[in-house]
Amino acid sequence: PNLVYCFLKIFFDFKLICVHHSSFRRINNAFIKKIVKYLYSKADAVICISSDMLNDYITQHKNKNGVLVYNPHDLARIKYLSNDINVIDKINSQFDCNLNEISYYTVVGRIIPLKRIETIVESFQNITSDNIKILIVGDGDPKYITAIQGLIKSRNLKDKFVFVGHLSNPYAVIKKSKGVILCSESEGFPNILVEALCLGKPIIASDCISGPREILCINGKLGRNEIIKNEFGILYPVGDALALAKAINYMNENHTTFIGSKIKSRVEEFNIMHIKKKYLSLINCLTK
């Protein structure tokens, strides 16, 4: 729709703000890149939802109408929904487990190859704790899910993974967990990381494009088999199972270093009211 409206702007005079949600680095076709560059230049503003995305837009397309505005998050609603114990009770009965007693990390999102769930499975040979489980929330590509479940079975890890499918309210599950793991090869902006921080939960995330570094406020180079950590979570290289195991082991052994109150304060700039002000300010500037 963005490009359609940009095309119409060639013929009609109206104000246009486009919101771009995916990484520009995923546009590999040279012809498509030229089309995107030309049409987006017609917009009054192109909102990018992460700094990496904005930098890529400026670098690749040389347009000067890029603006950084994060996705809005209703933090109060997320906190409210996280108190729904019915979600926990339903999972406990349906999957014969007790989320109130087990120690687990949560993975939330579409289960597709881009999410690299196999990295978690491969990391288990180097995880030192016998008590850790992984709760996977979401649906997706049936073939990929079957392949992951086959990999889990081949490594005798069936007791370590629970696939609960899609949940309309994953926040109660996140709240009970030790933290959230994201393994993606790439993201536009991983909203689940903001939602986890909102609930005071630390993050283990792949250093993918784009979002995790920005959300975690982590800088510095990251080599193979290495991790970078701060009070909000841990970053590891994409697809690096050994580094992911190091991250999980560190978080297990040093969980108290990730302070919930500091984690929660990090997400205020993603609050829906803050983002609303940014949109209103941009609209006012364009309509003067």
Predicted feature residues:
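A charged, aromatic-enriched C-terminal amphipathic alpha-helix characteristic of glycosyltransferases
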Residues: G239, E253-L286
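A conserved, positively charged/aromatic
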Residues: L16-D44
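A conserved mid-protein helix/loop that constitutes part of the nucleotide-sugar donor-binding site
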Residues: S103, V107-N126, K143-A147, L242
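Conserved acidic donor-binding segment of nucleotide-sugar-dependent glycosyltransferases
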Residues: C217-D240, Y250-H255
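Aromatic "clamp/platform" in nucleotide-sugar-dependent glycosyltransferases that forms part
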Residues: H166, E185
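A short, active-site helix/loop in glycosyltransferases that binds the activated sugar's phosphate group
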Residues: A43-Y80
